[in-house]
Amino acid sequence: AKGTAGGAKLRAFVSDVDTPGYKRPENPNHFALVIGIEKYSGLPQADYAERDASAVHRHLLAMGYPERNVILLTGKDAGRAGIEKYVESWLPRNVAVDSKVLIYFSGHGAPSAESGQAYLVPWDGDPQFLETTGYPLKRLYEKLGQLKVRDIVVAMDACFSGAGGRSVIAQGTRPLVSKADVDVSG
């Protein structure tokens, strides 16, 4: 696979860690939402985010997550409506008390200049209008906290500071730092 970063041509190589060499028995109580957004509708791309999400997807299947219980959202499918649908409707309808839930996000993150809240930037997100186009981290944690499940893991490969390659903050600006204060202990 080939891509560009900062105008330079890059070659992506698939490593042996990208392909699981194991297979565990299927567990019907394992659920995952895997989101990888590399090419945005109006933003710089987040290099390798979709490839990373696909690797996580393959590993989850090998770890016993049933394919019907693992949602992989990439590209246009990873818009705000898609993220909302799976976090706020699909998970609550499908998980049970003994379920394990994993949320993986690889893409852009950004803090709102107005509220200081951190947002996941969906495929159709606009960093200048995060309150209406982004997906707030606080909301994600609140929705996950409402699930009556045993275990929840959230893993993110996104920069919210403006200092890294997965942030949409203009270089040289000072972002506001937010703290999610949500009790998810049940």
Predicted regions, residues:
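Caspase-like (clan CD) cysteine peptidase catalytic core
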Residues: 29, 80-106, 110-169
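Functional beta-strand-loop-alpha-helix junction segments that form "active/interaction loops"
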Residues: 3-19, 53, 57-99, 131-132, ...
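Disordered regulatory segments flanking catalytic cores
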Residues: 1-47, 62, 146-149, 166-171
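Terminal peptide-recognition signature
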Residues: 36, 56, 103
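Second-shell loop/turn segments in exported
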Residues: 21-22, 39-47, 71-77, 124-131
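Active-site-proximal C-terminal subdomain of hydrolase catalytic domains
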Residues: 36, 60, 74, 149-186
